[in-house]
């Protein structure tokens, strides 16, 4: 299934950030958004994630609830453990042991229950990635 973006427009005040954007994103493909500051890259992603609404246009072939992203900044909750930072984004009653087992493939066991603010930068990044993929 593809994500089809048709004639998408978004304006902030009098600044037209997205103007008639048309893109087809094919399933199981990797894409990269590149461009100068202020061109609308983040706005487009925020619209795809349901965090922002377009002024006009349409997006089809996507269930907003299934979209996740990894921010440039980690956006972790510093006082929570790696496990709890992943757990907080999961719906329902996530199984703590299952999260622990999944995290063990990317983090040492003794770091899983530590507050993420005590982890190295690389470890924090791995927690952020695990959360985005959850």
Model-identified regions with their sequence ranges:
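Helix-to-loop junction immediately C-terminal to a conserved catalytic motif
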Residues: 49
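Conserved structural motif at the start of ABC-family nucleotide-binding domains
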Residues: 3, 18-20
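Hydrophobic anchor residue at the start of the ABC signature
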Residues: 129
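Conserved catalytic motifs of ABC-family nucleotide-binding domains
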Residues: 74-84, 88
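Conserved ABC ATPase "signature" region
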Residues: 96-112
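Conserved ABC ATPase signature
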Residues: 115-119, 123
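The feature captures the beta-strand-to-loop junction immediately N-terminal to the Walker
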Residues: 34-36
